[in-house]
């Protein structure tokens, strides 16, 4: 049985990934400081919740016999010394590192704090895993490209981060490659494009426009549209991202910090999405226009051929189908 640690496992992507891993027969531990996590996203699973890292250490010392489907949830920082000790001792085959302090706008206001978590603590986790964990699958971001010159964008595109968050992701990509070269460490970097779907709360700092607008419709609020609404995004449904993580984890390829676009491969404008929502929900969609946000790029669209070639990734669910699934989750 494969053993995994999912950081940020009570968040949007982490919770969906955790549920799929359990379904596939993995033994999963989750660590989440609950700053953006929601334990109810895992409520369908057999959970054993520990309130901090010291309880995790005590639990391991007891050598408790564990049911195969039991998920251990540690409510703490992934960089807690007790967590890192467990990683160092070789407790896991794979770490799926999803935890981060989001997002572009927050990083612009808080560059020091976000760098501490997204860079310094992440390197600490990688260091603890060196020589004891077979592979780290790490969540990078399409934001590393900035305003890409070439669309659809390939991984060979020059990186041009235009926010602290994007720079932090870029820095860890560079470190992952260095760790592979210096320490023979196996780290694969997945550059997520705009991920949306069930489990993403509209008031979360990670939320895409889709989830924010669904939240607004469900609660009788206004749908904020930034700028002229002509910006386009490669919207990637959550099942596709989970699929990519598992394919990368199971791949026989040795990764030396390689980076891969994980996306839908098509782009949709904010205006198109709002128009479709307006047609579907009528007067429930109340649009509030706002200025363009600092640090945001105008267009994103990925070429994911490299991920397809190296570990077989291609999207399972395309945008409009995923949007219907998202409506259903929101019950709107």
Where does each model-flagged region fall?
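Short alpha-helical
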Residues: 12, 37, 102, 201, ...
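Hydrophobic alpha-helical packing elements
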Residues: 13, 114, 168, 209, ...
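C-terminal substrate-binding subdomain of Rossmann-fold SDR/epimerase-dehydratase oxidoreductases
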Residues: 59, 69, 76, 215-332
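Hydrophobic alpha-helix immediately C-terminal to the catalytic Tyr-X-X-X-Lys motif of short-chain
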Residues: 171, 175, 179, 209, ...
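N-terminal Rossmann-like NAD(P)+-binding domain of SDR-like oxidoreductases, especially those catalyzing
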Residues: 1-195
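Short beta-loop-alpha junction of Rossmann-like oxidoreductase domains
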Residues: 147-149, 198-201, 271
């Amino acid at each position: 049985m494969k053993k995994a640690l999912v950081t940020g496992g009570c968040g949007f992507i982490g919770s969906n990934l955790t549920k799929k891993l359990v379904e596939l027969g993995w033994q999963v531990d989750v660590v989440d400081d609950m700053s953006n996590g929601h334990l109810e996203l895992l409520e369908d699973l057999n959970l054993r919740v520990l309130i901090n890292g010291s309880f995790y250490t005590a639990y391991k010392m007891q050598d408790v016999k564990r049911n195969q489907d039991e998920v251990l949830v540690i409510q703490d920082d992934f960089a807690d010394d007790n967590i890192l000790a467990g990683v160092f001792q070789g407790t896991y085959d794979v770490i799926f590192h999803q935890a981060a302090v989001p997002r572009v706008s927050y990083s612009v206001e808080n560059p020091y704090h976000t760098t501490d978590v997204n860079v310094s603590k992440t390197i600490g986790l990688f260091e603890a895993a060196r020589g004891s964990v077979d592979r780290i699958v790490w969540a990078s971001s399409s934001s590393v490209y900035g305003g890409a010159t070439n669309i659809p964008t390939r991984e060979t595109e020059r990186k041009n981060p235009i926010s602290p968050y994007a720079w932090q992701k870029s820095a860890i990509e560079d470190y992952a490659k260095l760790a592979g070269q210096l320490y023979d460490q196996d780290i694969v970097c997945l550059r997520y494009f705009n991920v949306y779907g069930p489990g993403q709360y509209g008031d979360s700092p990670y939320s895409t426009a889709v989830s924010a607008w669904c939240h607004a419709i469900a609660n009788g609020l206004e749908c904020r549209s930034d700028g002229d609404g002509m910006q386009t995004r490669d919207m990637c449904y959550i099942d596709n991202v989970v699929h990519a993580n598992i394919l990368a984890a199971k791949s026989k390829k040795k990764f030396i910090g390689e980076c891969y676009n994980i996306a839908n491969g098509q782009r949709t404008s904010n205006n198109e999405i709002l128009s479709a929502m307006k047609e579907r929900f009528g007067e429930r969609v109340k649009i509030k226009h706002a200025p363009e946000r600092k640090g945001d790029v105008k267009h994103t669209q990925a070429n994911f051929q490299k991920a397809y070639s190296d570990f077989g990734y291609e999207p399972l669910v395309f945008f409009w189908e995923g949007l219907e699934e998202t409506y259903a989750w929101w019950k709107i």
